[in-house]
Amino acid sequence: MQSPVFVMNTNGNRQVGHKAQMSNIQAAKAVADVIRTCLGPRAMLKMLLDPVGSVLLTNDGHAILREIEVAHPAAKSMIELARTQDEEVGDGTTSVIILAGEILAAASPLLDRKIHPVVMIRSFKQALEDALSIIDEITLPVNVDDNAEMFRLIRTCIGTKLVARWSDLMCHLALRAVRTVASTSNGRMEIDIKRYARVEKVPGGEIESSCVLDGVMLNKDVTHPKMRRRIENPRIVLLDCPLEYRKGESQTNIEISKDTDWNRILEIEEEQVKRMCDYIIAVKPDLVITEKGVSDLAQHYLLKANITALRRTRKSDNNRIARACGANIVNRLEDLREKDVGTGCGLFYIDKLGDEYYTFLTGCKNPKACTILLRGPSKDIINEVERNLQDAMAVARNVFFHPKLSPGGGATEMAVSVRLAEKARSIEGVAQWPYRAVADAIEIIPRTLVQNCGANPIKALTELRAKHAEGQHSFGIDGETGRVVDMHEYGVWEPEAVKLQSIKTAIESACLLLRVDDIVSGVRKHSE
């Protein structure tokens, strides 16, 4: 009898077929179970200790999963979903993980019945198309210029977060920041929150004293103590070049034969710095901000001309100042012209917050960049407020691009679930089971909302199903009490973009993991 032939390395860990699929499903369910309690206004907080030793307190799905270390490839894939959701729409990170985990859990008994994964994927894709059209039917348009409607929408996003107590303030901050950085070029709207809406966190004070500055704030002080620290309507010059003696680009050797040569070298250095300052003084600015250094001699010449200087600012800060006050960033002082001077700023002043000095450029006429100043009792709380505010700004930005609202409180998910269950009856053969499984799985969102506020899920879901069967698609769960309420009256709305992206991402990731029938864990070769 022939001995067995080993083609694959026997040291590696390998799972094949049904075992591999069940392993993926178990991993996905485990990740979903971690953040299941983080959904809704009664969400629990997670306390995480990161490798550096600092504590993270949050109920934001993406922030939690980012800190968790997992070994299973399917679990890593699930965590990637939360990142995608956060980058695309900014909200719904917890929902998408719970949905994906539940859809895969619903696929588990179907695999046990020996239904082929390809048949299931076909039904899942059909269910996805139908779900997207159902969401489109029950959405309402929103007027992005109406502050009351926008506030109601953003309040829903942050109602489940730590900052729910200060929801009016956060709505105001998020909406004002998004409106400030919105710009239209070539007939196309651009809202770049990441680049032009900077969040500056200063521990101390009260959360209520947080505000949006119509300009820019920097953690900088003037370079010379006698320079002016308050200037009204300043003329601003932005530079990307040093105000110091330009040394040789590479190593330079100079041979000195007389002592006068040495003095002449020093004079040349001074002349060069003076020439640089003369170029600046010629356009009569009040404030010079450079990304590079400013020498003591340059400070002296600028001080004599009554010009204030700031040095070593970040490139991103310089870009935001340029957007806020209308200045152009100059790379060579020889090219500095009157048109490069920014005159859009109303007030420049330096103020002390806590132990640090900060530069404020405020009162800008038409700022296309802003700074959000966050205050709070501790670093941990301010970090969580910042995460919540980023979500709120992302939601506001999405509504500007996609001005449609879906009812919140699990109403949209229940409407999709009930309508898909009705459609499942008209499907013949084995394909009906996976289709029905998606319908049942999407119901997990309202069920989790009820469970998280300690109410009876069976009673609440039966009542909610009955309302939706009658065609009342705006009924959902009040996340505070677990009662069934009409979202039109209750006023909980979410952007359609968040709902569409959640269901798309969840079903597509479930399809991806179901197609996997072989997991090979490679083992590194041990050095001899």
From Swiss-Prot:
InterPro entries from the entry? Chap_CCT_gamma, Chaperone_TCP-1, Chaperonin_TCP-1_CS, Cpn60/GroEL/TCP-1, GroEL-like_apical_dom_sf, GROEL-like_equatorial_sf, TCP-1-like_intermed_sf, TCP-1_chaperonin
Q: Tell me its family.
A: Belongs to the TCP-1 chaperonin family.
Gene Ontology molecular function terms on file: ATP binding; ATP hydrolysis activity; ATP-dependent protein folding chaperone; unfolded protein binding
Instruction: Say which species the protein is native to.
Output: Schizosaccharomyces pombe (strain 972 / ATCC 24843)
* Disulfide bonds listed in the record: 364-370
Query: What is one cellular component GO term in this UniProt entry?
Result: cytosol
The entry describes its oligomerization and partners as:
Heterooligomeric complex of about 850 to 900 kDa that forms two stacked rings, 12 to 16 nm in diameter.
Kindly list the positions at which Phosphoserine occurs in this protein.
250
Matching entries from Gene3D superfamilies are given as:
GroEL (3.50.7.10), GroEL-like equatorial domain (1.10.560.10), TCP-1-like chaperonin intermediate domain (3.30.260.10)
Q: Which UniProt keywords apply?
A: ATP-binding, Chaperone, Cytoplasm, Disulfide bond, Nucleotide-binding, Phosphoprotein
UniProt record, GO biological process: protein folding
Q: Which protein is depicted?
A: T-complex protein 1 subunit gamma
Q: What does this protein do?
A: Molecular chaperone; assists the folding of proteins upon ATP hydrolysis. Known to play a role, in vitro, in the folding of actin and tubulin.
Give the gene symbol.
Answer: cct3
